[in-house]
């Protein structure tokens, strides 16, 4: 079993695949270095002399600079490494020399639902979308009181509560409206009840304008202040929606119709070595099959965005990517925050030292395929292949944004573990075997087998594709079995 991995030949550090005790001789890629101190799993050890101020190289890329001289065998982490990041950057388009669509492969099929507008779905659920936080508890009670309607091909009745829809202004208010309307359009929702109070800022008329054309059999509205008994009224509407949703049955659908979100959270030092490269290989496989994948977490691209921007399929897509990256940096700066105020305490405990370190691991989820489009918050995926989506690193907010973009399911890699799920089925992928064994009630797929030397990234990616097809065909994720699903809306404005 290998002790460490030397990711790039030019790296001056290796990453411990397992804990390395002080005094252990570590041999990797022709290098032989004795650990001068204990090196925890996922953490970095110098394999070459690194001078004070010299860049620390991992993934073949600077992830910060040393703040003290370090000899081979030294533990390299937050105590002796600091970020190189600052503010906005002027980028230039330098397309990768091998930039071209990957060779096509005949897509497999899954057993999904075909909606009347032609879109594919992997779940056949009824959703209740509150337009304002004031009706959250009403929505929850409606769900609890009407579970008897979940019969036949209907797979669930759910609501997604939130605190917004009122006391917001301007862009913030518009973002909430746009996000909620996008959820109403999601294909996994066979039918939707939009539930409002009646006096909120997000008016019925505004919501209708945002929603645009819709199927009146699929989407119904209820304003609680307009009826005497909102529970009886909701029951009547849900009976109609259940009759509509119950018409759909699973049928063979090509994988090319799938949209898959890609996310990481609770990352550790193995995220960029096991789980994220596996997801990246999966993303390439999806692109070859004519499917779509979505990459977000813009702040966790900072410091590694060049890897992605050079893969934009053309100059127009590059310009959109540039505006997205610098726009998010401006968002930080406008709030008097530094762009490198990341990683989290859990990330650091797992071996991630700087934002560049985290970002270089994060972007591994994007694989090697060209970036075909860059889309805004609340906008749908319309282009096949790899898409970049405007959204923050926050797990709940970014996973909600990917769901709103049309992701049928989300691949979520984690080195520390997390139980949450978006409205779209959320597959948890562990970076290490101890986590998969400890939190078997959370983890759906273990890429720790790569660090253990049991499987290659290619083999793990093929296994992951097989699992995605099974989940798309109805197999429940661990989070679904627990009943976990929620949303969080991106907010950046004042509260009235």
What are the language-model segments listed below?
Residues 1-409, 416-496:
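Metallocofactor- and cofactor-centric catalytic cores in central/energy metabolism, strongly enriched
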